[in-house]
């Protein structure tokens, strides 16, 4: 969801020559990165109601599907991924952008890249149509390490990290696990399932935490793990089957996930939580965005509809 509190800002001249697939504000809301089928990434400086194109990044050999900013504690770093199966890491230093790392081991389109919460380290998860997920890690000695593993045989469409802090840990007397011990994320695939993965230090890879979450009857297009760290864990999943499923887990039994289903009249593409984790935005092929909140009875209500 946008980090701007009020109003919508429209960039009428994006500079792109083809369809735009992603547009993401940085942590401070001062820079906007966009990517397109024209194979480029563009960086805009945002100042109040005005914006200025400052850089065009080139290097991908096909459509660029996704861009994602790292946390500013790691510098001005941007990841991009595209149809060419490549993941690029870009860095801006003293006003100049450069490509500091290329990852090209995926055998098909890389659909989504997602940075982990900064407390867990400088980690980037990448979801690919080749059925695998890779996790890139920037090490203290300025080198990059990676793991890559099969996730969904028919292709991986989405990935979302869990909060670095476990639910309930900030309100309980005993401390939560160390940040690196909570390296967990959820993936959504073309096999209609969600899978939750946890880092295993003994093997230096990620293993499925439990059996897949099932119920969708078509591709899972997006997953979003709520950033809230209060009483429960929440995961939202959006599917081409016209439903959003909201999965909840209690800290007392973290491997058990309950599900509530929201029904829509169209295929769904994206789900996104607010920064506080209590509002869910849903968008699909009907060109609407709906906002949902959980009421005191535990039911989900649509509180706003935004139409183009």
Swiss-Prot record:
Keyword Repeat appears in the UniProt entry: yes
Keywords in alphabetical order: mRNA transport, Nuclear pore complex, Nucleus, Protein transport, Repeat, Translocation, Transport, WD repeat
Top-level taxon in the UniProt lineage: Eukaryota
GO molecular function (one): structural molecule activity
GO CC annotation: COPII vesicle coat; nuclear pore outer ring
Function: Component of the coat protein complex II (COPII) which promotes the formation of transport vesicles from the endoplasmic reticulum (ER). The coat has two main functions, the physical deformation of the endoplasmic reticulum membrane into vesicles and the selection of cargo molecules. It also functions as a component of the nuclear pore complex (NPC). NPC components, collectively referred to as nucleoporins (NUPs), can play the role of both NPC structural components and of docking or interaction partners for transiently associated nuclear transport factors.
One GO term of the biological process aspect: protein import into nucleus
UniProt family annotation: Belongs to the WD repeat SEC13 family.
Coiled-coil ranges per UniProt: none
Subcellular localization(s) per the UniProt record: Nucleus, Nuclear pore complex
WD repeats mapped onto the chain: 15-54, 59-100, 105-146, 151-207, 215-257, 263-302
Pfam families the UniProt entry points to: WD40
Gene3D superfamilies membership: YVTN repeat-like/Quinoprotein amine dehydrogenase
InterPro entries membership: G-protein_beta_WD-40_rep, Sec13/Seh1_fam, WD40/YVTN_repeat-like_dom_sf, WD40_repeat_dom_sf, WD40_rpt
Chief subcellular location: nucleus
Protein name: Protein transport protein SEC13
Assembly description: The COPII coat is composed of at least 5 proteins: the SEC23/24 complex, the SEC13/31 complex, and the protein SAR1. Component of the nuclear pore complex (NPC). NPC constitutes the exclusive means of nucleocytoplasmic transport. NPCs allow the passive diffusion of ions and small molecules and the active, nuclear transport receptor-mediated bidirectional transport of macromolecules such as proteins, RNAs, ribonucleoparticles (RNPs), and ribosomal subunits across the nuclear envelope. Due to its 8-fold rotational symmetry, all subunits are present with 8 copies or multiples thereof.
UniProt xrefs under PANTHER family: NUCLEAR PORE COMPLEX PROTEIN SEC13 / SEH1 FAMILY MEMBER, PROTEIN SEC13 HOMOLOG
């Amino acid at each position: 969801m946008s980090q701007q509190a009020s109003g919508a800002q429209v960039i009428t001249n994006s500079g792109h020559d083809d369809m735009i697939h992603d547009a993401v504000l940085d942590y401070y809301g001062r820079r906007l990165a966009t990517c397109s089928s024209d194979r480029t990434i563009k960086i805009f400086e945002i100042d109040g109601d005005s914006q200025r194109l400052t850089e065009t990044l080139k290097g991908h050999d096909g459509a660029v599907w996704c861009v994602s900013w790292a946390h500013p504690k790691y510098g001005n770093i941007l990841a991009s991924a595209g149809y060419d199966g490549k993941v690029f890491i870009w860095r801006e230093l003293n006003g100049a952008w450069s490509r500091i790392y290329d990852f090209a081991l995926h055998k098909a389109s890389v659909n989504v890249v997602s940075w982990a919460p900064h407390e867990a380290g400088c980690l980037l998860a990448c979801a690919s149509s080749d059925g695998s997920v890779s996790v890139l890690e920037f090490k203290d000695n300025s080198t990059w390490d990676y793991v890559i593993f099969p996730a969904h045989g028919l292709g991986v469409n989405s990935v979302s990290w869990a909060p670095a802090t476990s639910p309930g840990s900030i309100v309980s007397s005993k401390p939560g696990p160390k940040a690196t011990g909570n390296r967990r994320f959820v993936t959504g695939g073309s096999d209609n399932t969600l899978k939750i993965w946890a880092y295993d230090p003994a093997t230096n890879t990620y293993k499925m935490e439990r059996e897949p979450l099932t119920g969708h009857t078509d591709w899972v297009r997006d997953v979003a793990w709520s950033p809230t760290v209060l009483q429960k864990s929440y995961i939202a999943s959006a599917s081409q089957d016209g439903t959003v499923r909201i999965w909840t887990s209690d800290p007392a039994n973290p491997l058990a996930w309950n599900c509530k289903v929201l029904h829509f009249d169209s295929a769904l593409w994206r789900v996104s939580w607010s920064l506080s984790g209590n509002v869910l935005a849903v968008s699909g092929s009907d060109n609407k965005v709906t906002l949902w909140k959980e009421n005191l009875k535990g039911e989900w209500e649509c509180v706003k509809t935004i139409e183009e």
